[in-house]
């Protein structure tokens, strides 16, 4: 477990074999807890990466759709302007 400053607790050196075994068990449990937390963080990051990839694809599709719409509006505008120019240059009947 981490201390108040985020530093890992370091057990003081024991004088007997029994203290050392307890320290080893504590370290193993701490490493197992850290590994579990890292696995959870990794899983969350994978999930965020998938969401980011999905959003990136959606935004690219939206951008392409907007480009197509803009081109269509430009073509329609040119056709309307060309039609108005042709009608405007003809003498009234």
From Swiss-Prot:
What keywords are assigned to this protein?
Answer: Cell junction, Coiled coil, Cytoplasm, Cytoskeleton
**In what ranges is there compositional bias, type Acidic residues?**
17-26
Q: What is this protein called?
A: Bublin coiled-coil protein
Coiled-coil zones? 59-80
Question: What organism, scientifically named, is this protein from?
Answer: Taeniopygia guttata (Zebra finch)
- One of the GO biological process terms: intermediate filament bundle assembly
InterPro entries according to UniProt: BBLN_eukaryota
One GO MF annotation is: molecular adaptor activity
Q: Please spell out the taxonomic lineage of the organism that makes this protein.
A: Eukaryota, Metazoa, Chordata, Craniata, Vertebrata
GO terms for cellular component: anchoring junction; cell junction; cytoplasm; cytoskeleton; subapical part of cell
Primary location group: other
Pfam families in the record, alphabetically? UPF0184
Q: Where in the cell is it found?
A: Cell junction; Cytoplasm, Cytoskeleton
Q: Which domain of life is it from?
A: Eukaryota
